[in-house]
Amino acid sequence: MEKKCFFTGHRGLGADFDRQKAYELIKILNEKCGVDTFVCGGAVGFDIEMGELVLKLKEEHSSVKLWLFLPCLNQDAKWNYTDKARRQALIDRADYIDCPQVYYDSTVMKTRNYKMVDTCFYGISYFNGKRVSGTAQTLRYAKRQGRKIFNLAKEGNDAINGL
């Protein structure tokens, strides 16, 4: 558990999202904290961005692993072509894939998110302070479980403490 980190974040990323800062954080977790497995939900937005950065880090450090926790096989059914292609690229290069269901239902996202938290000690989020969201729900659960969370969204840093 101590060597794993999950990602949780919003689909829409704000102008404050900094890919380089995000990359540096996963690199520090790998090199300084020994994190070797990064767990990604494979969703549009933050998940795909972070999954791609893990693959970049993997080019430098072959011990790094990408673990996809997909909520269901048809997760991308309503996505545009570009987002589907980016998700497929993650699937093609992932070291591990968990996908408990074929079809979407009202429980798959929460189940996936909690399983990611249960598997990891660290978490990286992009949380903008919106308290009614899957990201907020996941972060509340992670806090109750005692996980160490790093937030990349500037406007959500104060809000994360109030969850």
Residue ranges and their predicted role:
Residues 1-163:
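Acidic/glycine-enriched connector segments
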